[in-house]
Amino acid sequence: MEVNIVNIANEVVGSIDLNPQVFGLEPRRDVLKEVVNWQLAKRRAGTHKAKGISDISGTTAKPYRQKHTGRARQGSLRSPQFRGGAVIFGPVPRSHEYSLNKKVRRLGLKVALSMKVAANKLVVLDSLDVDLKKTADAKGVFGNFAGHSSYLVVSESCKEEVVRACRNLRGVDLLKCVGINVLDILKHDCVILTVDTVKSLEGRLSNE
C-alpha cells in the first residue's frame, strides 16, 4: 500500500509503503465504539454528589409523637419526603474507569488509521522540523492542505515554537506519537503523520 510523502508545502517528495496490517484493515465500528466509550469513561471526573440522610444538617429529633396524632408516623425531618430532605441512593464520587483488553485498544487504533487511509484523509509528512514562529505562519502552512475541516498532526517530536504557533489555531491539534488515540483520530477530519511516526506505529502495532 503505497502513499505519497509530502513536505510542508504539500509537494510530493517521495513515497512510502504502508503496512497493511496497520493501515489496511476493514472497518470495525463495533471495535471503535468500544474504544471510544472506554476513553470517554476514563475522562469523566466522577465528582457528582448528592447529600444522603447522614450528610444533611438539621435536627435529629423525632418531629412529633408516634401515635394518636392522625398523621403518618415520621422519624426525621431529614427524610426524602420532606422539602430539603435527603436523596436516597443518590450519586457519590467515584471513578467511571474500567479496563479494556490491550488487543481491543490496539485493534481500534489500527482500524481508525485504516479508515483514514481508505477515505484519503491521511497525509504522510516528511518532517515537522520547520521554522514556525507565529500563528500566521502556521495558518499559511495548513492553508496548503486545504479542503479539510480539522487537522490532527502526530509527530515523534516537535519544536516548542511549532507548538506555540499552532496552539491558537482552531481545528488544529498536535500530538506526540505516544499519545495517539482513537478518539482524537475520529474527531479530526485529516490526520497528518510524519514518516518517523509511521515507522514507530508500524513497529508498535504490526506484530499484534
Curated annotation (Swiss-Prot):
One of the primary rRNA binding proteins, this protein initially binds near the 5'-end of the 23S rRNA. It is important during the early stages of 50S assembly. It makes multiple contacts with different domains of the 23S rRNA in the assembled 50S subunit and ribosome. Forms part of the polypeptide exit tunnel. Residues 49-78 are annotated as: Disordered. NCBIfam families: rplD_bact. Disulfide bonds: none annotated. Belongs to the universal ribosomal protein uL4 family. Transmembrane segments: none annotated. This is Large ribosomal subunit protein uL4. One of its GO terms (cellular component) is ribonucleoprotein complex. Pfam families: Ribosomal_L4. The gene is rplD. Keywords: Ribonucleoprotein, Ribosomal protein, RNA-binding, rRNA-binding. Part of the 50S ribosomal subunit. GO terms for biological process: translation. GO terms for molecular function: rRNA binding; structural constituent of ribosome. Signal peptide: none annotated. It comes from Anaplasma phagocytophilum (strain HZ).
